[in-house]
Amino acid sequence: MNNFVFYSPTEFVFGKNTEVQVGALARKYGAQKVMIVYGGGSVVRSGLLDRVKQSLQEAGVAYCEMGGVQPNPIDGKVYEGIQLCRREQVDMMLPVGGGSVIDTAKAIAAGALYDGDFWDFFIGRAKVEKALKVAVVLTIPAAGSEGSGNTVITKTETLQKLGLCAPEHLRPVFSIMNPELTYTLPAYQTACGIADIMAHIMERYFTNTPYVEISDRLCEGTLTAIIKEAYRVKQQPDNYAARANIMWCGTVAHNGTCGVGREEDWASHALEHEISAIYNVAHGAGLAVIFTAWMAFMAEHNPAQIAQFAHRVFDIPKSEDLEEMALAGTARLKHFFRYMGLPVSFKELGIEHPDIDRMLVSLQRNKGELLGNYVKLTMTDCREIYRLAL
């Protein structure tokens, strides 16, 4: 196990009707004026936005708002939000939604207190040294942004989809999580969220770091739980227990708990970011395609941890042939994704002829010559993984 620092100060308020506490919590954390950030009309139609506003009013917290955040969030809304934030003298960001909304709010929180272009943070030209506080009302379990210091934004001019990690400044001070708010999610969106959650765990799980049994078991237990609950929610979309477990899995998957003391990989996310940046597909769907291709590649090149995953998560019998075990586990994961209605190939994703050369040029520009840690991938390796996903 490697040395580590684990810092996770977010206050999670979980359960039915918890959104009505948002005003009191915002006041508790010193907010005078918040910016509510949201996406489409669902938070309006459901009455959630009105409940949030009423709670803020009752607590004496002023607010302004910005809607229209799209999936795979773009830089344009961040620039718009920064201007609004400064004009309205906001001191706390309050995203009401899923990962795209939260990530947009985090980028605004960092950019509002920075004299330059917020994109400087994403390309490594500047480091986040201060930011507005961020608080969350979560409606879509997937990205885990409600408990992480991460944000991912796409720059439309260059189609660069890049991430930023600044946990000291961008991890939410509190997150409200009511599983009932997820009842009305379409089945495909629920499935994409589950794939995203699983990918966050697997990026941490597939490691060469020895003697990490406790975090191995945390990863495996969380994966096993979410697979079980996914089957249940597929049949019973309004099952509170299933929705609650999936929502909490999303947080545990990405708040750092599963990755302590171990070298993480993150190659699959980088490979997928090129797909969703260029083709604007759902991130979770892209991950279902890429992760199974990545695992098939690793079955040949470094099968040990893939084989352990196959045995402990999907009950594949132990064998001396680790590659065979790894491929069997990958096949079971593909079967699960397909059952959930997810694609496991570019064709199923709706991309008949992916421009692999274009993706590789962008990938190399964004990430350099080598990718990941489980196996250091060259651009030739990355081409092969994209090819395996055809």
Predicted regions and their residues:
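A glycine/threonine-rich phosphate-anchoring loop and its flanking beta-alpha core
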Residues: 113-211, 308
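Short glycine/serine/threonine-rich phosphate/pyrophosphate-binding segments
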Residues: 19-22, 45-48, 75-76, 100-106, ...
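C-terminal charged capping/lid subdomain of soluble metabolic enzymes
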Residues: 306, 313-390
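Active-site segments that bind and position negatively charged phosphate/pyrophosphate groups
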Residues: 204, 208-332
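Conserved beta-strand elements of the Class I
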Residues: 35-36, 92-94, 135
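N-terminal amphipathic/basic leader segments beginning at the initiator methionine
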Residues: 1-29
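N-terminal small/polar loop signature for handling phosphorylated ligands or for N-terminal nucleophile
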Residues: 44-116, 232-243
